């Protein structure tokens, strides 16, 4: 019996006991299977949100890099990142990848510990190490190690036999493969892989149904298989205090770089590096060669003790996918023109030969023909411009600096200046058609022909240009101003408007002053008065020109107050960044001549007529309103009243020690303002003086009350009104005790019924009072125990009697 198992009260013995145990075991197994299936299903549904916390607690530099870059080879894209990878280990489905997953890590481990451990081994070094964390910042026990190449990852796995020992703990290593994306959908507009639950594109908001209908199958694979090429590479994992010189020193054995080829990104607040930098080379082929050299280095490139990751700097714009599987840059023809214009401006500024290498684009690829055509056109344009400049360099002494029309489409805030011929030079007149034909591909891909019917403008397709503040229409090459609703043609420098009836672009109304230049001045004045006051293209251009000049003048005054006089001319060659938008559209040749320093003799010869100024817009003929011409002429003459060499005000005959004092005198001095007013009026003709006085009267406040007082005099003040007094009406009320108390009252009758007789006192022995009790008034004191006074007051007393009694009581109290 010793071998028999003792059965408890809750356990059933006999033949039913084994059946129950078997049923319990089966139930536990089925429950575990259901739990596993539920876990897999929930993990599939939550795959996009499973590891969001690693992005929340990652470094801001790495977060910005992941947001701005797309990983096409391993399937990392901005909508999914590492959430697209399958973390469940299945040996049969495991495929080689350049990303390795480390599982079973200690909770206290950090990314730096993993990086130091991997750098201690010989062989290929990782490009990036990412530790997955929870929202609390605690490690989740696994991390991802990314290598530059697939061969590096496979050799690392073979060398370590898929096992590591970190902090005394055995770590398992597996290839991290992306999950199949058959349930995801690809946006047809921006080529972004979106989750299957999204009904609209995460980036551009395109409808899912349209993309599924238009995008052919197999497009995703074609996008992943095509490499990305550009002329800029990105350097990641840069130390916070690394400088540009350190980067140049590290890259000097492999490429010849200048300081302007490297851009180190820094934080605006801390002024420390944000962890990455950009290196721009002359062509995409040079960038590709440098990238291959840096990625093949063993050990990898290090700058200030940090292992640097190298890759192409991918643009924020995605690549479009054609049905045949080829990729075309998502930059429209407008963006191509912008790039070509920037190339032209930078070449003219640096003075080097304009050669652009488009060899990285394969012949036959879509877009190759356009880029080749733009390259040829702009090389020809640059050669013509440089040839004209060399021929005119010896003939012209004062060279003006203006911005070209190509700067209209500049995407960066930089100014691309080029020297041009002075107004009216033979070179300029001899080559108007050539410059127009060469600029046509850059500014407008199609051009606008007057009289040709076009489709109705679609403002949703316009692209905003930050440098000019206008919207660019890629179909017509025009710039749209939403405020005035005019279109600007950068080729002809003319304003247009859309005519819905004719379905074409019609030039804005231009003045006819050029046709009637030979008529007498009186007739011109009448025509100007009869001209309607509508805002034409000339007036719009004039307003923007005046606005740009005012901004430039303010900025030049501020800059010149801190600089010597000899650097003034060099400073004036630089355009103001605040007025870049106005000058990029409306500045033409000869704009700087108005701001050149003038000697005092020009003030004495100011009676001579000024030469006609060349308009900033080709369509502007100089025929503007009288007020605008008056203001402009006065402003040009006022600039001659200051000698900036001697620091003297010629109008007030005052000399100052520095430029700042002279500027303050012009802006704040009452004497200068009075003299300027007198000078302005002396320079005006009778008609202009009348117009100015009329304008001042309209702008001045008219005190009509003062005019009335001056005409009719001040009237006498009215007599003050007296207050009306109303006598209160007398009210008859009952006064039974006015004449004394008689025997007819109720109290007297009650006392007589009890045996009381008139004249006797109250009480059993008639010892009480014989007269009735009179009402008395007691004056209020200051508190308890204060001495007060009382005086008799009857209801029949008048106000005068009551006052007399109170006064008498006070008098007796004083005694």
Curated annotation (Swiss-Prot):
Q: Which residues form the G-patch domain?
A: 743-789
Q: What is the lineage of its organism?
A: Eukaryota, Metazoa, Chordata, Craniata, Vertebrata
Q: Does the keyword Zinc-finger apply?
A: yes
Q: Zinc finger (C2H2-type) residue ranges?
A: 647-672
Principal localisation? nucleus
Q: What is this protein's gene name?
A: Rbm5
GO CC annotations, alphabetized: cytosol; nucleoplasm; nucleus; spliceosomal complex
Question: What GO MF terms are annotated?
Answer: mRNA binding; RNA binding; zinc ion binding
Q: What name does UniProt use for this protein?
A: RNA-binding protein 5
